[in-house]
Amino acid sequence: MLVNFLLVGFGAALGAMLRYGISVLVKSKWKTNFPSATFFINITGSFLLGFLVSSALGPVWQLFLGTGFMGGYTTFSTFKVESMELKWKTNYRVLFSYLGFTYVFGLIAAFLGMMLGV
Protein backbone atom coordinates (compact mmCIF):
# COMPACT_ATOMS: atom_id res chain seq x y z
CA MET A 1 0.00 0.00 0.00
CA LEU A 2 2.79 2.45 0.85
CA VAL A 3 4.46 1.62 -2.47
CA ASN A 4 1.30 2.73 -4.31
CA PHE A 5 1.33 6.09 -2.53
CA LEU A 6 5.01 6.53 -3.38
CA LEU A 7 4.39 5.65 -7.04
CA VAL A 8 1.60 8.21 -7.28
CA GLY A 9 3.57 10.86 -5.39
CA PHE A 10 6.76 10.45 -7.40
CA GLY A 11 4.81 10.43 -10.68
CA ALA A 12 2.89 13.55 -9.63
CA ALA A 13 6.11 15.36 -8.74
CA LEU A 14 7.61 14.60 -12.16
CA GLY A 15 4.40 15.61 -13.94
CA ALA A 16 4.18 18.89 -12.02
CA MET A 17 7.81 19.72 -12.80
CA LEU A 18 7.22 19.09 -16.51
CA ARG A 19 4.05 21.22 -16.40
CA TYR A 20 5.97 24.06 -14.76
CA GLY A 21 8.79 23.84 -17.31
CA ILE A 22 6.38 23.88 -20.25
CA SER A 23 4.43 26.75 -18.71
CA VAL A 24 7.57 28.86 -18.27
CA LEU A 25 8.75 28.08 -21.81
CA VAL A 26 5.40 28.81 -23.50
CA LYS A 27 4.84 32.03 -21.55
CA SER A 28 8.32 33.27 -22.44
CA LYS A 29 7.81 32.58 -26.16
CA TRP A 30 4.21 33.70 -26.70
CA LYS A 31 2.71 36.80 -25.12
CA THR A 32 -1.04 36.50 -25.57
CA ASN A 33 -4.30 36.93 -23.66
CA PHE A 34 -5.12 33.29 -24.43
CA PRO A 35 -3.81 30.90 -21.72
CA SER A 36 -1.71 28.94 -24.25
CA ALA A 37 0.44 27.08 -21.73
CA THR A 38 -2.46 25.59 -19.76
CA PHE A 39 -4.33 24.84 -22.98
CA PHE A 40 -1.34 22.96 -24.42
CA ILE A 41 -0.74 21.07 -21.17
CA ASN A 42 -4.36 20.00 -20.76
CA ILE A 43 -4.81 18.92 -24.39
CA THR A 44 -1.60 16.90 -24.47
CA GLY A 45 -2.52 15.52 -21.05
CA SER A 46 -5.94 14.44 -22.33
CA PHE A 47 -4.30 12.64 -25.23
CA LEU A 48 -1.68 10.94 -23.07
CA LEU A 49 -4.14 9.89 -20.37
CA GLY A 50 -6.49 8.50 -23.01
CA PHE A 51 -3.58 6.52 -24.42
CA LEU A 52 -2.56 5.22 -21.00
CA VAL A 53 -6.08 4.22 -19.99
CA SER A 54 -6.60 2.13 -23.11
CA SER A 55 -3.11 0.61 -23.21
CA ALA A 56 -2.15 -2.72 -21.72
CA LEU A 57 -0.01 -1.23 -18.97
CA GLY A 58 -0.06 -3.03 -15.66
CA PRO A 59 -1.54 -1.54 -12.49
CA VAL A 60 1.83 -0.28 -11.22
CA TRP A 61 2.41 1.75 -14.40
CA GLN A 62 -1.20 2.96 -14.38
CA LEU A 63 -0.69 4.31 -10.85
CA PHE A 64 2.68 5.91 -11.62
CA LEU A 65 1.87 7.34 -15.07
CA GLY A 66 -1.92 7.69 -15.07
CA THR A 67 -2.80 8.75 -11.55
CA GLY A 68 0.58 10.22 -10.58
CA PHE A 69 2.33 11.73 -13.59
CA MET A 70 -0.77 12.78 -15.52
CA GLY A 71 -2.45 14.01 -12.33
CA GLY A 72 0.53 16.25 -11.67
CA TYR A 73 0.91 17.27 -15.31
CA THR A 74 -2.64 18.33 -16.14
CA THR A 75 -4.27 21.18 -14.30
CA PHE A 76 -8.03 21.51 -14.07
CA SER A 77 -7.83 24.09 -11.29
CA THR A 78 -5.54 26.43 -13.25
CA PHE A 79 -7.90 26.11 -16.21
CA LYS A 80 -10.79 27.29 -14.02
CA VAL A 81 -8.84 30.11 -12.35
CA GLU A 82 -7.60 31.42 -15.72
CA SER A 83 -11.18 31.26 -17.01
CA MET A 84 -12.40 33.36 -14.08
CA GLU A 85 -9.57 35.86 -14.61
CA LEU A 86 -10.66 36.27 -18.24
CA LYS A 87 -14.24 36.82 -17.04
CA TRP A 88 -13.14 39.45 -14.52
CA LYS A 89 -11.18 41.23 -17.24
CA THR A 90 -14.38 41.04 -19.34
CA ASN A 91 -12.37 39.43 -22.11
CA TYR A 92 -15.35 37.31 -23.18
CA ARG A 93 -14.11 36.47 -26.67
CA VAL A 94 -10.95 34.87 -25.29
CA LEU A 95 -12.87 33.34 -22.36
CA PHE A 96 -15.40 31.52 -24.53
CA SER A 97 -12.72 30.52 -27.04
CA TYR A 98 -10.64 29.08 -24.20
CA LEU A 99 -13.58 27.19 -22.69
CA GLY A 100 -14.81 25.86 -26.02
CA PHE A 101 -11.43 24.92 -27.42
CA THR A 102 -10.34 23.23 -24.19
CA TYR A 103 -13.44 21.06 -23.91
CA VAL A 104 -13.74 20.19 -27.61
CA PHE A 105 -10.05 19.58 -28.27
CA GLY A 106 -9.68 17.83 -24.90
CA LEU A 107 -12.36 15.31 -25.86
CA ILE A 108 -10.88 14.84 -29.33
CA ALA A 109 -7.39 14.37 -27.88
CA ALA A 110 -8.61 11.85 -25.29
CA PHE A 111 -10.50 9.94 -27.99
CA LEU A 112 -7.46 9.84 -30.29
CA GLY A 113 -5.23 8.73 -27.43
CA MET A 114 -7.66 5.94 -26.56
CA MET A 115 -7.82 4.80 -30.17
CA LEU A 116 -4.03 4.70 -30.45
CA GLY A 117 -3.63 2.95 -27.10
CA VAL A 118 -5.75 -0.03 -28.06
From Swiss-Prot:
Record localization: Cell membrane
Keywords of the record: Cell membrane, Ion channel, Ion transport, Membrane, Metal-binding, Sodium, Transmembrane, Transmembrane helix, Transport
Recorded GO MF terms: fluoride channel activity; fluoride transmembrane transporter activity; metal ion binding
Chemical reaction(s) catalysed: fluoride(in) = fluoride(out)
GO cellular component, as recorded: plasma membrane
InterPro entries: FluC
Pfam families linked: CRCB
Membrane topology of this protein: Multi-pass membrane protein
Lineage top rank: taxon: Bacteria
Chain positions recorded as Na(+) binding sites: 71, 74
Transmembrane regions listed in the UniProt entry: 5-25, 47-67, 98-118
Gene Ontology BP annotations: cellular detoxification of fluoride; fluoride transmembrane transport
Activity regulation: Na(+) is not transported, but it plays an essential structural role and its presence is essential for fluoride channel function.
Biological role: Fluoride-specific ion channel. Important for reducing fluoride concentration in the cell, thus reducing its toxicity.
Family recorded in the similarity comment: Belongs to the fluoride channel Fluc/FEX (TC 1.A.43) family.
Protein name: Fluoride-specific ion channel FluC 1
The species this protein was found in: Listeria monocytogenes serovar 1/2a (strain ATCC BAA-679 / EGD-e)
Gene: fluC1
